[in-house]
Swiss-Prot record:
Taxonomic source organism: Escherichia coli O6:K15:H31 (strain 536 / UPEC)
Region: Disordered, residue numbers: 707-729
Gene that specifies this protein: fadB
SUPFAM superfamilies membership: 6-phosphogluconate dehydrogenase C-terminal domain-like, ClpP/crotonase, NAD(P)-binding Rossmann-fold domains
Official protein name in the record: Fatty acid oxidation complex subunit alpha
PANTHER family: TRIFUNCTIONAL ENZYME SUBUNIT ALPHA, TRIFUNCTIONAL ENZYME SUBUNIT ALPHA, MITOCHONDRIAL
Amino acid sequence: MLYKGDTLYLDWLEDGIAELVFDAPGSVNKLDTATVASLGEAIGVLEQQSDLKGLLLRSNKAAFIVGADITEFLSLFLVPEEQLSQWLHFANSVFNRLEDLPVPTIAAVNGYALGGGCECVLATDYRLATPDLRIGLPETKLGIMPGFGGSVRMPRMLGADSALEIIAAGKDVGADQALKIGLVDGVVKAEKLVEGAMAILRQAINGDLDWKAKRQPKLEPLKLSKIEAAMSFTIAKGMVAQTAGKHYPAPITAVKTIEAAARFGREEALNLENKSFVPLAHTNEARALVGIFLNDQYVKGKAKKLTKDVETPKQAAVLGAGIMGGGIAYQSAWKGVPVVMKDINDKSLTLGMTEAAKLLNKQLERGKIDGLKLAGVISTIHPTLDYAGFDRVDVVVEAVVENPKVKKAVLAETEQKVRPDTVLASNTSTIPISELANALERPENFCGMHFFNPVHRMPLVEIIRGEKSSDETIAKVVAWASKMGKTPIVVNDCPGFFVNRVLFPYFAGFSQLLRDGADFRKIDKVMEKQFGWPMGPAYLLDVVGIDTAHHAQAVMAAGFPQRMQKDYRDAIDALFNANRFGQKNGLGFWRYKEDSKGKPKKEEDVVVDDLLAKVSQPKRDFSEEEIIARMMIPMVNEVVRCLEEGIIATPAEADMALVYGLGFPPFHGGAFRWLDTLGSAKYLDMAQQYQHLGPLYEVPEGMRNKARHNEPYYPPVEPARPVGDLKTA
């Protein structure tokens, strides 16, 4: 053996050909700082081999390299700019030395080669892949850009347009697309990968393939005329501005860096990449987006641990068809769990089946499935007016009208029709689970399962643990939600659970602003354009349904009378009484008309101003800062209360529930990440300016204690000490 590190080794294969094998402990290879340093040492050994003729890179895992070790990022991003820049120079010197070896090199790439894994193989002369390949540079999704030469090598290999599409969007592509655009040189079956790579290497060694000519473009300026460059980069910048917007600086920075580096050779181009990467790594956006990635891993890991001893349900049932029931049935069937869909009338069943068929037809139109697959999935949804087949189901979710009496009656009747070990769940959005459990003989087999609309798009499912819900019940429902491709987060029971409990104080802040004379149009604009919500509160209420919000508001007020009870008529009351229910009947804060694609498009409606004038003070202007503060403080305070009361277990789960359930702007990272970025002391100062507005603006005691020492909610992160000889950079 020529070299052995903790995560890779180097050995001779045959006749002057060496293999460098990535083989980290555990299930996957990551390109962490230690592996980069180890790679440098291995290349140092290769540089001393006078009889070296060629090099094969491969992996001993099911995936080549899944990317950099993102768990290192937050601490790496705290390293001072100069030191981080030095380390990146060192890392790039390693990849340059790989690229500059005086022999042909090939990467045999199986499975994933993402981020640093992709950048590593870009430094080799040839790339041969297996059909399961996913290769790309997702860094911009984490608020950064490629830092190991990806923004330099990829455009010079693929051309500017293809590279910009991958880098700016943070995309990865499959084997066929990678071959088409020149990211890999061939695709072979997994069992032929090493054999095929060796054949290419021998051809290069024998002179049948000109490996030096293959390498040369990566070392030179980008081959684009001034007109071509102007077109490519202008179009790319326009697309990025439209899709990413001002809150996500990484994509536009990446495009501008590639543009600036286009006229330079490798060394100067890499220097420009370094100068762009380092400031991005120190942005709040990068910390927030990396935090979301890590929180997502944490939440999924927690679900996996929770379900390790239970069997995933093999047969499910939905009570109540319609749009929501049809959406749940589709999602379950689509992911391989057959479902019985029951309702008391044919019309609702037809609506539910139509919804499922519509979603499947969209998959067909996009080429994701063929007619055979569509027929196969739809055949696993069984509509019924009775309880036929319910003796075989493992889990039932009730999705009938949001009325406790109706829900209790339906659940109690269903309990008599299923096996004693069948789990029942309610898709209620606000009614306490422990209250509904009172109607059941086996409350330990019951919990909440709150889906978000539209079911097929929204990743979150809130799993609500009632007072008597057993651990096994929770685990089975979490397993089903995970099987459906959802992100389940377990919360404890209370009115509104977690997501709706924190949403309604936000709506209350909106109502108070309107009462004090604010214009809902400006509030929507500020909360969308400045804070970054996908919809402002008025638009969101129209989408949720003014009638739904009016009902839920009453439930929340009964549950938390001290904070959420109001003693005045507000905008929601005014619109509800005027039969303006939002998008569902075309009239809410806005008027809605269908566009050419049949989607509701909002328009101004002056009638609303007259309605709101009856429940508001005369119109006056509010600053953007005041609007954001008055909207966000009630929500954030309630989020903190939920953590303090144990409704939600951790800041990570709270933030993921907000991002996945409400669309909390990802570049803020969630309420707790936003709080930590702001600082608890600064937040307290801001909130105290508004505490005269009522109990929703009063900061919880636990947060006051944290603010005294400006303590964060997430565990403090220490700056990293990257492995690598900075002096050689």
